[in-house]
């Protein structure tokens, strides 16, 4: 017996779908949060104390650790501003 249960294909005629209704295939391009970002985070690298609060609170985990500061991956950052609001030094904006 197979571990996976197979399901019958959906039958349009049995479901009563009109013949003139044509299903259309849609191509969806992958869209990252950074593609629709409204704000861009900026870090004052001289004043960053590397507390990692921005890294901890980022909902999309776009904060990247470097030797002396944290930076943001702008491809995944959605511009929500949580990092700036949570930063105790207010070094990201």
UniProtKB/Swiss-Prot annotation:
Gene3D superfamilies: 3.30.70.20. Transmembrane segments: none annotated. GO terms for biological process: L-phenylalanine metabolic process. Induction: Induced anaerobically by phenylalanine, phenylacetate or phenylglyoxylate. GO terms for molecular function: 4 iron, 4 sulfur cluster binding; metal ion binding; NAD binding; oxidoreductase activity, acting on the aldehyde or oxo group of donors, iron-sulfur protein as acceptor; phenylglyoxylate dehydrogenase (acylating) activity. Activated by magnesium ions and thiamine diphosphate. It comes from the Bacteria. It holds the Pfam family Fer4. PROSITE patterns: 4FE4S_FER_1 (PS00198), 4FE4S_FER_2 (PS51379). Residues 39-68, 66-93 form the 4Fe-4S ferredoxin-type domain. Its EC number is 1.2.1.58. It catalyses: phenylglyoxylate + NAD(+) + CoA = benzoyl-CoA + CO2 + NADH. Its cofactor is [4Fe-4S] cluster. The keyword Endoplasmic reticulum does not apply. It is an enzyme of class 1 (oxidoreductase). Keywords: 4Fe-4S, Iron, Iron-sulfur, Metal-binding, NAD, Oxidoreductase, Repeat. InterPro entries: 4Fe4S_Fe-S-bd, 4Fe4S_Fe_S_CS, PadF, PorD_KorD. Binds 3 [4Fe-4S] clusters per heteropentamers. Dimer of heteropentamers composed of an alpha (PadG), a beta (PadI), a gamma (PadE), a delta (PadF) and an epsilon (PadH) subunit. PANTHER family: PYRUVATE SYNTHASE SUBUNIT PORD. This is NADH-dependent phenylglyoxylate dehydrogenase subunit delta. It comes from Aromatoleum evansii. The gene is padF.
């Amino acid at each position: 017996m197979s571990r996976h249960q197979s399901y019958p294909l959906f039958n349009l005629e049995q479901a009563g779908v009109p013949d003139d209704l044509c299903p259309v295939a849609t191509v969806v391009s992958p869209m990252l949060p950074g593609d629709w970002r409204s704000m861009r985070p900026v870090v004052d690298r001289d004043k960053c104390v590397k507390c990692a609060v921005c890294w901890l609170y980022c909902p999309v985990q776009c904060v990247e650790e470097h030797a002396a500061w944290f930076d943001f991956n702008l491809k995944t950052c959605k511009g929500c501003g949580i990092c700036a609001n949570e930063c105790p030094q207010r070094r990201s904006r």
